[in-house]
Regions:
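Alpha-helical transmembrane segments of multipass membrane proteins
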Residues: 89-93, 120-125, 162-173, 285, ...
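Alpha-helical transmembrane segments and their helix-start/interface "positive-inside/aromatic belt" motifs
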Residues: 69-82, 150-160
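Transmembrane helix-loop-helix hairpins at the membrane interface
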Residues: 164-167, 190-296
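Alpha-helical transmembrane segments in multi-pass membrane proteins
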Residues: 82-137
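Juxtamembrane helix-loop-helix connectors linking adjacent transmembrane helices
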Residues: 105-114, 139-212, 230
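Cys/His-rich metal-coordination motifs, chiefly Zn-binding "fingers/knuckles"
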Residues: 1-40
Length: 296
């Protein structure tokens, strides 16, 4: 079989899943044994969603996590377990953050935000490392932390496009909610107390507009989205990962806009083959939100 029966994309030799839609391919074609030809054992560089694998790293055959384009070594089971573990970690993270915040006096809210962001980053890093990339060659590439497919200028423009689309959808959603005068589904009003005052606001920006975008994009796009593609295909994986991303924000008022943002970020990751444009778009939105709370 030379083409995917689901979407018609030409298959790659030995690929277990279609590089475009993630459909499972039957009767994979075996590659000739390189060992039998007296050649060093090589494996293709594991690819991000929709990015063809490249044979630029030499691994032992037992170490190579995947040679199929768009395939990662973890699957839906690890994704579900990872989501559960991160959710459970919210309990100790919240307890520690509030305990530390109680010692900060008038800056308790800002301290709680800063501490919780960094503790969640550690939690996510541990979960992703253990369930996804532990003992895997080039783990950063498996998570999309690789160079972008397009030139820098085009990648930045795509990120800005995703940011603009997210902001526009959020404005439209807020207008619709206000039209129906629904307090339940209105975005929550977050006070300026979440930020440190004066020059110390740098630490709030560092937490919310740098650490949060990196860790969330690695988890929701690099780990969850990529891990769901082989089982559900790209479109369903985008929807499911966006739903998880939205649910993690624990507020009915942002459920819809965050879901739409999650779709845009998954599409951006799919388009660029790298997490970094997603981080840029995510960071821009968070930085704008913090700046409005501090300076507006």
């Amino acid at each position: 079989m030379n083409y995917c029966p689901n979407c018609g994309t030409q298959r790659i030799e030995s690929a277990a899943y279609c590089p475009r839609c993630g459909h499972a391919l039957s009767n994979p074609v075996s590659q000739p044994s390189q060992e039998n030809q007296g050649m060093p054992v090589t494996a293709e560089m594991p690819a991000t969603p929709d990015m063809p694998a490249t044979p630029d790293v030499i691994w032992g055959a037992e170490e190579a996590p995947s040679t199929a384009a768009g395939q990662v070594p973890w699957r839906g089971g690890q994704v579900v377990l990872g989501i559960i573990l991160v959710l459970v970690s919210l309990i100790p993270v919240t307890g520690i953050a509030f305990a530390v915040g109680a010692l900060a006096g008038r800056y308790d809210d800002a301290t709680i935000v800063w501490v919780s962001v960094h503790l969640m980053a550690i939690s996510i890093a541990m979960v992703v490392w253990r369930l996804g990339v532990h003992k895997r060659p080039a783990p950063w590439r498996l998570l999309g932390l690789n160079p972008m497919r397009y030139p820098l200028a085009k990648s930045v423009l795509l990120a800005l496009g995703a940011l603009g689309g997210s902001l526009l959808l959020t404005v439209i959603y807020s207008a619709v909610v206000n039209l129906f005068n629904s307090d339940t589904f209105s975005p929550p009003d977050i006070g300026g107390e979440i930020a440190f005052p004066g020059a110390a606001a740098f630490f709030t920006f560092q937490a919310v507009a740098l650490v949060t975008p990196i860790t969330e994009e690695v988890f929701f796009r690099g780990f969850v989205f990529s891990g769901l593609i082989p089982r559900f295909g790209v479109a369903k994986a985008m929807v499911l990962s966006a739903l998880v991303f939205s649910a993690f924000h624990l507020s009915l008022g942002v459920l819809v806009p965050v879901f739409l943002t999650g779709l845009l970020l998954a599409l951006l990751y799919r388009k660029t083959g790298s997490i970094w444009p997603c981080v840029l778009a995510h960071a821009g939105q968070n930085a704008l939100a913090v700046a409005l709370k501090i300076y507006a």
